[in-house]
């Protein structure tokens, strides 16, 4: 597997998009912080995309997998399925990006392709991720590119703030002992027709200010989010006026408009 990363030299102020939300205008970038494989997230996401009417959809996923997106609507391409990335000279170094029919990312792909809307993955290329793993290393949960702290259901549990589990912290603040139950009540079993995404982004933003980041995960997440912002700026430079960004909820505050510095 080979890939070339070309940093985009985009001035933070190079794209001027003024809007008045109070007047009903929509921002040039809307971020939809989802939970991977969440049926409620998928349902709310499709409704939000229909409302926003984006002219570009950027999805958290390996940017070098963009050529595969054209197969999403192919006959027989039915989830569950997964993207597989591996180093050609050491195939044991591999990573998977799985999708179910109720995965928000899968629904976002279908939404865009069925409407001839530009769609692309916006996360670090798989080649860049795999290249950082030591030779001979094999995939494990700590290195899973698609699992961040807000997402993998099997690792969510009530823990302390210092252990950096955002869903558990928010659940505890809301009076829940079980973060799974809290998220289910908030999003997955949500009956309210209003979008949950602004609330999710605000909550994650406050939580990130309190919790901060440190260690290896912080370096990795900072690098990923900087790359995703580059892809958003590139879409705006191409003249896109409504860019929908579908990403794990933890990343949403760092990708919302106006964009933070690169």
Question: Which stretches of residues belong to each language-model region?
Answer:
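Compositional signal for N-terminal targeting/processing segments
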Residues: 1-262
